[in-house]
Structures are given as structure tokens and as C-alpha cells.
């Protein structure tokens, strides 16, 4: 376990890191296992080793990857804690939707108000 | 494996439950608050499909339709390894309060970080969230 909870990057950083399909693919690869950069790169025909290194850095900065040295190699694995922040984003989706529900229902069902 | 603590959202609407309930099940009315519905069969086992934003489609199936009180449906994103169809459920309960309705929405079964390492089915959620956040 690394980084205290208070040091987590904000959800924007996490979401930006996740916005790239190659980076999401990297996270899928290292979920539940540790891989060196070379083996990660081997899964991508169209991305250079340099490109992969850059993606790894972005993911690490977002707190989504943890790195461990094993001899001369660096092994990467998923660090899922920031996903809680992302879950918090979904927690904003439903209240926003309910606000739209309220607006729609109340527009369609105006209070009978005065007479008639 | 599912989340022990669901997401809960509530709101008060100035209309009786009978006026609110159709918005929870009928395609043209769902479109007014969640997303464009391409179909909805509001009965247990009946399916619906919604488009949220440009490219996120949600598929679900009604489990309970109890007008004008309660509706339960599954909520999933097909073709993604997160939120596979049927993996999470949304429950909406309508409670009359004078002339108003209290709406309580509970989303059960969302993946959490503690289980993400072991559980397939979370990265598609991230795709959805990225779009929600981008709005």
C-alpha cells in the first residue's frame, strides 16, 4: 500500500488518465497481475515503447498504477483506489437525472393553482 | 460480488405518484430525464434501451413494475467489461407526501475499488463516467 488517501489526485486527473483507450487497455492488462513495461508494450502493435512509457507515467500520476522494482525490472500493477473518486462522479449522475425528472414532471403537471 | 453500499439519490416532486410513475417506465418519458429510449416494455422481464450522450447505450430489464409505487430494473452497458447487462440494479420508490412525491433512487451493485482487482467488469464503467464528466 502506498500514498495516503489525502494525497489522491483529483477526479479530473483520474478521468483524463482514463480518457485514452490505450491506457484503459493497459489497466486491463495489469489488473490482478504485475507486468514489466516491455510485456505491456508487446500487447500494442501500433504504439511505440516510448508511447507506452508515457502512458505508464500518466497512469502513475493519476494513482492508477503502482510500480515495484524487482532486480533491474520495474513491474506495474493496477492500483484501484482512485476508482472510488470516479464512482463519486457517477454519484452525481443520478441526482442530476432526478433534477431533470422533477423539471419534466412539474412542467407537464402545473399546479392547479387558483380557480377552475 | 457487489458493492455493500449502494448509491442513493432522492428528490421531491410537486405532483402525485400517479403523475410521476409513467416517467419511470415509458420510453418517451424516460427520454426526458435519463436519455433517448429506443424501446421500453414496462413489465417484469420487459427490456428497455437508452442512449446517454453520443455513444453510451444502456440496456436494462424491468424486474418489478408496481404502479404507482415502485420500479426495479437492471442497468448495464452491453459490450463492455464493466457493468455487463444485469450486473447492477436500480430501484426507484415513490412515496406520497401531501400533494408531492418523494422519489428515492437506489443503484445497487456498482463495483468498488476493493473488488476491482479481482472482478472483471469495471473498466466500461469508467468509459461511461468519462463521458458523464465530460458533459
Go through each PLM region and give its residues:
Chain A
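A cross-family signal for key residues in well-ordered alpha-helices
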Residues: 16, 28, 60, 66, ...
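Beta-hairpin "wing" of winged helix-turn-helix
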Residues: 60-71, 77
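Short hydrophobic/aromatic segments of transmembrane alpha-helices and their interfaces
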Residues: 7-9, 41, 66
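Alpha-helical interaction segments
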Residues: 65-67, 82-85
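N-terminal helix-turn-helix DNA-binding core of bacterial DNA-binding proteins
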Residues: 2, 12-48, 74-84
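Amphipathic alpha-helical dimerization/coiled-coil segments
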Residues: 1-10, 28-32, 83-116
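Short, hydrophobic-biased segments on the C-terminal half of alpha helices
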Residues: 56-57
Amino acid at each position: 500500500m502506498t500514498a495516503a488517501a489525502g494525497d489522491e489526485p483529483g477526479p479530473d486527473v483520474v478521468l483524463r488518465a482514463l480518457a485514452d483507450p490505450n491506457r484503459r487497455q493497459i489497466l486491463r492488462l495489469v489488473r490482478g497481475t504485475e507486468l514489466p513495461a516491455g510485456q505491456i508494450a508487446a500487447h500494442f502493435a501500433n504504439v511505440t515503447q516510448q508511447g507506452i512509457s508515457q502512458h505508464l507515467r500518466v497512469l502513475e500520476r493519476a494513482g492508477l498504477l503502482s510500480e515495484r522494482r524487482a532486480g533491474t525490472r520495474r513491474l506495474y500493477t493496477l492500483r484501484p483506489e482512485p476508482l472510488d473518486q470516479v464512482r463519486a462522479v457517477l454519484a452525481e449522475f443520478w441526482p442530476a437525472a432526478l433534477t431533470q425528472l422533477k423539471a419534466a414532471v412539474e412542467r407537464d403537471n402545473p399546479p392547479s393553482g387558483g380557480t377552475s | 460480488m457487489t458493492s455493500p453500499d449502494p448509491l442513493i439519490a432522492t428528490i421531491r416532486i410537486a405532483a402525485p405518484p400517479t403523475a410521476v410513475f409513467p416517467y419511470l417506465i415509458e420510453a418517451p418519458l424516460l427520454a426526458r430525464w435519463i436519455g433517448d429510449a429506443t424501446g421500453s416494455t414496462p413489465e417484469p422481464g420487459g427490456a428497455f434501451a437508452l442512449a446517454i450522450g453520443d455513444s453510451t447505450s444502456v440496456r436494462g430489464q424491468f424486474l418489478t413494475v408496481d404502479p404507482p409505487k415502485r420500479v426495479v430494473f437492471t442497468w448495464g452497458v452491453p459490450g463492455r467489461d464493466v457493468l455487463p447487462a444485469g450486473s447492477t440494479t436500480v430501484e426507484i420508490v415513490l412515496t406520497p407526501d401531501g400533494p408531492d412525491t418523494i422519489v428515492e433512487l437506489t443503484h445497487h451493485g456498482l463495483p468498488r475499488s476493493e473488488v476491482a482487482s479481482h472482478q472483471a467488469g469495471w473498466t466500461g464503467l469508467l468509459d461511461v463516467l468519462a463521458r458523464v464528466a465530460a458533459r
